Amino acid sequence: AMRAHAKSMVFPIGQPNDAFAQYFIGHSYLFPVSTSQVGVFNVTFEPGCRNNWHIHKATKGGGQILIGVAGRGWYQEEGKPAVEILPGTVIHIPANVKHWHGAAADSWFAHLAFEITGEKTSNEWLEPVTDEEYDKLK
């Protein structure tokens, strides 16, 4: 399944995302598309994989842009319904907004993640998305 997913992708899957594994349920993979000017990473999630709730903090600017590139996934801001991400879907995540993103339960998923430059930027990793919350998504 991973090999079939890799063939459908424009960007490499990359390496296991071990540095951030503690903030994910399931396995994810990371490929740095660009690290100059703006950080751009291809993040691949196995089916059911999602990251914890988190916040991209900044006093000015900051945040993140996600662009779906393969498979099917989800993005959710706290207090709002989840949004389906398909190839070509663009998600603008403002700084200081609690959210999570990851694969659908039945699909491999990949998105490009663009780190938006800002002042005093940092990431705050929070609690996992519960199975109860996640299992409601279809």
What do the PLM-derived regions correspond to, one by one?
Residues M2-F41, N52, S122-K138:
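A short, N-terminal "cap"/entry segment at the start of jelly-roll beta-barrel domains
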Residues S36-V38, E46-R50, R72, E119-K120:
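Short, charged/polar surface micro-motifs in flexible loops or helix N-caps
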Residues T44-E46, K57-Y75, F114-I116:
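Short, conserved beta-strand element in jelly-roll/cupin
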Residues W53-H54, Y75-Q76, I93, K98-A104:
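Short beta-strand His + acidic residue motifs that chelate non-heme Fe in jelly-roll/DSBH
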Residues G79-N96:
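Short acidic-glycine-tyrosine-enriched beta hairpin
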Residues D106-W125:
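A short hydrophobic beta-strand segment most commonly corresponding to one strand
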